[in-house]
């Protein structure tokens, strides 16, 4: 299990602002209707980007954390299995969704997020990750 500490990045306002600006710059290559993020550290980056781009922010949360009807996807982690969910009314048919997360490792969580968008009727416009653990190959998937 590999964890990366993002607190040093987000506590430095200049570094955090530059990170958000770089995400926005990359996101402008795509047609985006909504921005989704994976709980919880993806929320830090995606909420700022959503605010600045004036796009709806969709939370992809751990199992049983959302109050309304949800779609669910189970996926494998390095240390077991997990489930992420999205509200059924969050993504509409043919919505183009940018998925943002703090990190990509094996790609399992990103793949599950893409399945949630697909199940909801949307399409993944792109993924943007702040950190890529190249040795684990997730960005190749």
Q: What do these predicted regions represent?
A:
Residues 1-141:
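PRPP-associated nucleotide enzymes
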């Amino acid at each position: 299990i590999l964890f990366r500490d993002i607190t040093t990045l987000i506590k430095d306002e200049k570094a955090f602002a530059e990170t958000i600006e770089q995400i926005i710059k990359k996101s402008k290559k795509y047609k985006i209707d909504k921005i989704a993020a994976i709980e919880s550290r993806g929320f830090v980056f995606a909420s700022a980007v959503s605010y600045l781009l004036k796009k709806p922010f969709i939370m992809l949360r751990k199992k049983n954390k959302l109050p309304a009807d949800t779609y669910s996807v189970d996926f494998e982690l390095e240390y077991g299995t997990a489930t992420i969910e999205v509200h059924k009314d969050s993504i509409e048919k043919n919505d183009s969704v940018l998925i943002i997360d703090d990190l990509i490792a094996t790609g399992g969580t990103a793949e599950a997020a893409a399945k949630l968008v697909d199940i909801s009727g949307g399409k993944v416009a792109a993924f943007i990750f702040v950190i890529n653990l190249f040795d684990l190959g997730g960005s190749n998937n």
